Amino acid sequence: LCDAWAQGDARIRVIHKKNGGLSDARNVGLDAASGAYISFVDSDDYIAENFIETLYDLLHEYHTDISAVHWKLVYADAPEVPAPLSSRNVTLFQGADAIRELFTENTYACYAWNKLCKRELFDTIRFPVGRIMEDLGIAHKILFDAGQIVYSDEPLYYYYQRDGSILHTDC
């Protein structure tokens, strides 16, 4: 399926790689990336139709290095998609403020998947391979290096919860 899409659209590139885990896959993607921005979507999650557009618009409207949106937990037995917000609240952070928020309120969160980042933030940073919650291993570095971050409370990322996922398996 992916190969067929890539044949029909020059913007799509497929990378075939032996499974090395989530961090390894993200790092391969970072190494191959040529665009100005990076965003991640985990394999069992899904996003709103306007996810990337909203993140891009926020990043440019507020002149930030990172834009982020809220997420909604979605369960296998009730995969509802939330109705769009009639209005959204937007918060701006400086890098150190975002780190403080990350480790206290956790509104912003350390996840890689609800954000759009300028690619250069990843120039010297890669995800630690073989770790669960690898996002936390680099979140503080990315947030610190970011000049300014914009966060919207609009839930546009759907974090799928299932029994067999990485975070729901016994270690």
Residue ranges and their predicted role:
Residues 1-171:
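Nucleotide-sugar donor-binding/catalytic module of glycosyltransferases
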